[in-house]
C-alpha cells in the first residue's frame, strides 16, 4: 500500500501540493476530487474509455446495415464499400499529422474536442445522406468522420500517457481497446434491430428509415463528445491544482527517417497491411456472406459477424500480458497469421459451423495486435518511433481504402467464393512475410524473437 501511495504521488504531483493549491488553504480534497488520488483517476479513466466508444460504434454502421444500405440507397457492393474507403483516405495523411496537431496546434484538450466534433458532424452528415436519399452525402459524411476518428484515438492515448504511467499504462491501453471493441459489438447487434423498430414505426423500409436509424446512432458520438468536454475540464483542473504540464503525444514525425527504415521494419509493414486488409473488409461484407452461404437470419448473421470484436474485448489485455511475459513476438505473429489463414480457408471451402472459424479469427486477430505492433519499438531507435508508427498506420489505411474498393468489385463480379480466395491470398502473403522476417531476424541476431528473460538480460547488460 505504501508503494502504491508513493506511485500515486509521483504520478501526478504530491498530495500536499494538491492541498495547498486550492485557494491557498492547506486542506485535503476528497478522494473523488483530488487529481492525485486513485478514485479521481478512475473517474478520468472511465471518461477516457468512453471517449472512443461513439467512434468505434459508428465506424461499422455500414457493416451492421449492409443489406439495408444497399437496398435503400440502391447501390452495388462496390459503391457500398466506398463508405469504408472514404473513412480511410484522410487517414493516409492524418496518421502523420494527428500527433503534430495535438502537440503544436490545438493542445490535447482542444484537439480531443475538435476531433470528437468531426466524428459527430461526420455521422450527422452520413445520416442526412440517408434521409435525403443522397449517397454522395453519405460518402462525404464518412470522409469527415474519418478525419476525426483516427486522430481521436491518438488523443485518447495521449490522455492515457498523461494520467497513467509505468505498470498501469498497459492495463489502461487494454481497457481502452476493450471498450472500443464493445462499441463495435453493440453496433453489430443493435443497429439491425433498431432499423426494424424504426421501420415498424414509420410503416415502411426505405432511405428515410435508414437515415433515422443512423441519426439515432449519432447519440453515441454526442456521448463521447460530452466525455471529451468533461475530460478537458478535469485535465485543466488537474493542471492548475498539481501544476503539471498538458499532455503531449511525444511523436516526432520526420519524413527523412523513412530512408533509414530497415528490411525487418518493411516486412512488419507488409505483414500489417496484408493481414488487416483480410480482416476489416471481410467484416464489412460479412453479414450478407453468412446470410447467403449459411442461411443465417439477419440477427444471427450480425451476431457471428461481431464475434471477432466480442473475443477481442477481453482477450486483447490477456494476450498483451502473455506476450509481455513470454516474448517470442515473431512466433506469436506466425501463430496468429497461420490461424487466420485456416479460418478463411474454412469459411471459403467448407460448410462447417462458421462460429468455429470466426472464433478462431477473433483469437488470432487479438493475438496479432499484441505481438506485431510492439515489434516496431525493437527495430527502430526511440527518436524514429513516431515516424515508424505514423508510416505503419498510413500505409495500413491506404491498403484498407484500396482493398475495400477492390473487394466490392470482386464481390459484384465474381461472388463471395472468389472474394474469400482473394482474402486467403492476402493472408498467405502476410504469412510469407512473417517467415521472411523470422529468417532475416535470425541472420541479424534474433532480437525480435527473444524471450522475455533474454530481453531482461539485454537490458541489464546494456543499461541506458
UniProtKB/Swiss-Prot annotation:
The keyword Transferase does not apply. Its main location: membrane. GO terms for molecular function: dipeptide uniporter activity; protein homodimerization activity. Disruption phenotype: Splenomegaly and development of severe liver disease characterized by extravasation of erythrocytes, sinusoidal damage, loss of liver sinusoidal endothelial cells (LSECs) and fibrosis. Normal life span but there is a significantly higher occurrence of liver tumors in old animals of more than 1.5 years of age. Significantly reduced levels of Glmp. Conditional knockout in LSECs results in a tuberous liver appearance. GO terms for cellular component: lysosomal membrane; lysosome. Keywords: Lysosome, Membrane, Phosphoprotein, Transmembrane, Transmembrane helix, Transport. It catalyses: L-alpha-aminoacyl-L-arginine(out) = L-alpha-aminoacyl-L-arginine(in); L-arginyl-L-alpha-amino acid(out) = L-arginyl-L-alpha-amino acid(in); L-arginyl-glycine(out) = L-arginyl-glycine(in); L-alpha-aminoacyl-L-lysine(out) = L-alpha-aminoacyl-L-lysine(in). The modification Phosphoserine is found at residue 20. The chain crosses the membrane at residues 38-58, 82-102, 112-132, 134-154, 190-210, 214-234, 265-285, 303-323, 330-350, 360-380, 391-411, 417-437. Signal peptide: none annotated. GO terms for biological process: dipeptide transmembrane transport from lysosomal lumen to cytosol; protein localization to lysosome; protein stabilization. Induction: After 24 hours of starvation, up-regulated in the brainstem and down-regulated in the cortex and striatum. Following 8 weeks of high-fat diet, down-regulated in brainstem and hypothalamus. Belongs to the major facilitator superfamily. Homodimer. Interacts with lysosomal protein GLMP (via lumenal domain); the interaction starts while both proteins are still in the endoplasmic reticulum and is required for stabilization of MFSD1 in lysosomes but has no direct effect on its targeting to lysosomes or transporter activity. The dileucine internalization motif is required for lysosomal localization. This is Lysosomal dipeptide transporter MFSD1.
Amino acid at each position: 500500500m505504501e508503494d502504491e501511495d508513493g506511485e500515486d504521488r509521483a504520478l501526478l504531483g504530491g498530495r500536499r501540493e494538491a492541498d495547498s493549491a486550492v485557494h491557498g488553504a492547506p486542506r485535503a480534497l476528497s478522494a473523488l476530487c483530488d487529481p492525485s488520488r486513485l478514485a479521481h483517476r478512475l473517474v478520468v479513466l472511465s471518461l477516457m474509455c468512453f471517449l472512443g466508444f461513439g467512434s468505434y460504434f459508428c465506424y461499422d454502421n455500414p457493416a451492421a446495415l449492409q443489406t439495408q444500405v444497399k437496398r435503400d440507397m440502391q447501390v452495388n457492393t462496390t459503391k457500398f464499400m466506398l463508405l469504408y474507403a472514404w473513412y480511410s483516405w484522410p487517414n493516409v495523411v492524418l496518421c502523420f499529422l494527428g500527433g503534430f496537431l495535438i502537440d503544436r496546434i490545438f493542445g490535447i484538450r482542444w484537439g480531443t474536442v475538435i476531433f470528437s466534433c468531426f466524428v459527430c458532424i461526420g455521422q450527422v452528415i452520413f445520416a442526412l445522406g440517408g434521409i435525403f436519399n443522397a449517397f454522395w452525402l453519405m460518402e462525404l459524411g464518412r470522409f469527415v468522420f474519418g478525419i476525426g476518428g483516427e486522430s481521436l484515438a491518438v488523443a485518447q492515448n495521449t490522455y492515457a500517457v498523461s494520467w497513467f504511467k509505468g505498470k498501469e499504462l498497459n492495463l489502461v491501453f487494454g481497457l481502452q481497446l476493450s471498450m472500443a471493441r464493445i462499441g463495435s459489438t453493440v453496433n453489430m447487434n443493435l443497429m439491425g434491430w433498431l432499423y426494424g423498430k424504426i421501420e415498424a414505426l414509420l410503416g415502411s423500409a426505405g432511405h428515410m428509415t435508414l437515415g433515422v436509424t443512423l441519426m439515432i446512432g449519432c447519440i453515441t458520438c454526442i456521448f463521447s463528445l460530452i466525455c471529451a468536454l468533461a475530460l478537458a475540464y478535469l485535465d485543466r483542473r488537474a493542471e492548475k491544482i498539481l501544476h503539471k504540464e498538458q499532455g503531449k503525444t511525444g511523436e516526432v514525425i520526420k519524413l527523412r527517417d523513412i530512408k533509414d527504415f530497415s528490411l525487418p521494419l518493411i516486412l512488419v509493414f507488409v505483414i500489417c497491411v496484408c493481414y488487416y486488409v483480410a480482416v476489416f473488409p471481410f467484416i464489412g461484407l460479412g453479414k450478407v456472406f453468412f446470410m447467403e452461404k449459411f442461411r443465417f437470419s439477419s440477427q444471427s448473421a450480425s451476431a457471428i459477424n461481431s464475434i471477432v470484436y466480442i473475443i477481442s474485448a477481453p482477450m486483447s489485455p490477456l494476450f498483451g500480458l502473455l506476450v509481455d511475459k513470454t516474448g517470442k513476438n515473431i512466433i506469436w505473429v506466425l501463430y496468429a497469421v497461420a490461424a487466420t489463414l485456416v479460418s478463411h480457408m474454412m469459411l471459403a471451402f467448407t460448410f462447417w459451423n462458421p462460429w468455429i472459424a470466426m472464433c478462431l479469427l477473433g483469437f488470432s486477430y487479438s493475438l496479432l495486435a499484441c505481438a506485431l505492433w510492439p515489434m516496431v519499438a525493437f527495430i527502430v531507435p526511440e527518436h524514429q518511433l513516431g515516424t515508424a508508427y505514423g508510416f505503419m498506420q498510413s500505409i495500413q489505411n491506404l491498403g484498407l481504402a484500396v482493398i475495400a474498393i477492390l473487394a466490392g468489385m470482386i464481390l459484384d463480379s465474381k461472388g463471395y467464393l472468389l472474394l474469400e480466395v482473394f482474402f486467403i491470398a492476402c493472408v498467405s502473403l502476410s504469412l510469407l512475410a512473417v517467415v521472411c522476417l523470422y529468417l532475416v531476424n535470425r541472420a541479424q541476431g534474433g532480437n525480435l524473437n527473444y524471450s522475455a528473460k533474454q530481453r531482461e538480460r539485454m537490458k541489464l547488460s546494456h543499461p541506458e
